[in-house]
Each structure stands twice: as structure tokens, then as C-alpha cells.
Regions:
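An amphipathic, aromatic/His-enriched active-site/gating alpha helix that lines ligand/cofactor pockets
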Residues: 51-79
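Short, well-ordered beta-strand segments in beta-rich or mixed alpha/beta enzyme
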Residues: 1-2, 37-61
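Surface-exposed beta-strand edges and their flanking turn/coil or helix-capping segments
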Residues: 12-14, 48-49, 60-62, 75, ...
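Short S/T/G/P-rich N-terminal loop/turn motif that feeds into the first structured element of a domain
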Residues: 1-27, 32, 43, 55, ...
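Flexible, active-site-adjacent loop/turn segments at secondary-structure boundaries
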Residues: 9-10, 38, 76
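A short linear hydrophobic-aromatic micro-motif
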Residues: 30-37, 72-74
């Protein structure tokens, strides 16, 4: 996520534990914040969040966005290696069923 300039100014003026703030919201939605890292580059912070479903994650994004302190965010859904291997097996069984466009 990236903070607005106003949020960055507020954090500099009055430092606060943003991990605790994020954990409070995520816990209220039934999720778990595994870790939060501050970063520099395209984004200001990265959070590793575990949630019961996509609805919970969307609700969290909406709640944070409604606060007005975030200028942009990016979500990457992760899967375990076991789930990825199961997907590979499924793809192997289905790959012949797909006919790419030709022309």
C-alpha cells in the first residue's frame, strides 16, 4: 500500500504503530496479520494477511480505503505449495481440452 502525503506527514509529526492499527482491523474482520513491513519504492508498506475468504479481504480493503490515508494498494493472493501442486495436476489433466485461437 502507499500512504497519501497527508498520512505520511501525520506519521512523521506523531509516529504511531501502524502494524497495531492494521492488526486491529484485520482481527475485527476475522483475519490474522502475520507481518507488516515498511518499504520504499512503488509502495510504502507490505502486509502479509491471512483471511477466511475473499469477502473478508475485500472488506478490509474497503475499510482501509474509506479512511482516506491510502493512495494506492495492490493485492496478491497467495497459495500454498500443496495447493499449487494440486493445480498443476488439474491443469495437466485439462490442458488438451483447450484449443488456442489460430489464424
Amino acid at each position: 500500500l502507499s500512504y497519501t502525503s497527508e498520512a505520511a506527514k501525520a506519521m512523521i509529526t506523531s509516529p504511531s504503530d501502524r502494524k497495531a492499527a492494521a492488526a486491529s482491523l484485520i482481527n475485527a474482520l476475522g483475519g490474522k496479520l502475520h507481518e507488516m513491513y515498511f518499504s520504499f519504492g512503488d509502495y510504502d508498506a507490505v502486509c502479509l494477511i491471512e483471511g477466511p475468504d475473499d469477502k473478508m479481504m475485500a472488506a478490509g480493503a474497503m475499510a482501509v480505503g474509506a479512511g482516506g490515508s491510502i493512495s494506492k494498494a495492490h493485492t496478491t493472493k497467495l497459495m500454498s505449495v500443496d495447493d499449487a501442486m494440486a493445480a498443476m495436476t488439474m491443469a495437466g489433466k485439462a490442458v488438451g481440452a483447450y484449443k488456442p485461437p489460430v489464424g
